[in-house]
Amino acid sequence: MYTEFRVAKRGDTMIYLDQAATSYPKPPKVGQAMCETLHSAGNSGRGAHHFSLAASRIAYGARAELAAFFGAENPSCIAFTANATESLNLALSGVLNPGDHVITTELEHNSVLRPLYILENRGVEVTILPATRAGNVDFPSLLPEQLRPNTKAIVVTHASNVTGSMIDMEYVGEFCQERGLIFILDAAQTAGFYSYELKKSPIDILCFTGHKGLYGPQGVGGIYVKPGITVRPLKVGGSGIQTFSRTHPSQMPEALEAGTLNLPGIAGLRAGVDYVKNVGLHRIRQQEWDLTSYFHTEVTKIPGVEVYGDFSSPQRCPIVALNIHGFESSLMSQALAEEFSIYTRSGGHCAPLMHGALGTGEMGALRFSFSHLNTREELETTLGALRDLSSREWEDFL
């Protein structure tokens, strides 16, 4: 139904199953919006002339669109960043101080772990909750016993980028709300997939990227900050307002947006959000679950395939991670790409502790991630390729 902008490469149909890395293909209106912005707008907030005002309208329009999409209190709750990584660095360094205690999990991406390691060296206490072999975290039994008098925040990913398993966000949110803790959510995999209503949610800070489930371009993302929560900026400088003050503006969103915005990227992101709204979150999620469920059911029938993660509930992202006979995942991914033009992700997925929990630290995992633009036929072709690879010996890949 939504295949009018599929791409054929070298005369063959490319099967792109790396949607968790970046969505592809992008809606044509994304690129169109970016090009139009390059030719029709100046610098947002940097002048009173037509070109500058046009830029300000583009930035505000996208901000308002995102606020409505996420159910935020108002557009000023949304600040633009380069990506989810910048948003997470901003959130963690902006709320935690030496002597504070923060809780996270083994599910996390390095975009959470590495900033926390730096903060730990500066005096922040860090607790990492273990994951099960299935890639889940038992929050009800683990969180209460890890609470300390100086606990300030909990930061978790909404869904693992390795297995696709989603956490019990409601439990964690209520736990934070009841104890006055700051709840920071990494929505890199769930923005554009999960329907948020932030003004009614216990989420205090939501970090998202634009180039995955929101179908925007790479290089633009954002951070939602609930009114009443203060986040110190990572950078200060030009803001377009309060020029003669020695301090950077403290009000949102200017507080977190020093310097020139990526206006073409922001325009493209708005076009991506418009696309998601037009298709419908519910429809996207249902189609992606249908594809994921079908692929999981069929791939587990292939000899030598081990699948990771919990598939007992449709409350998950469209990801299936697996290995074949314990072969190194990078070799399997390379074979799929070179022999079948099937593009996947292998290795550690920037989530080292999760691979430790899954027991895949040495070989990594072969990750298939889908979007509603993928088809059953593409998955059938992929399953045939996996049956082929499964029938081979290790030496065949060397």
Model-predicted segments: where are they?
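Pyridoxal 5′-phosphate
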Residues: M1-L398
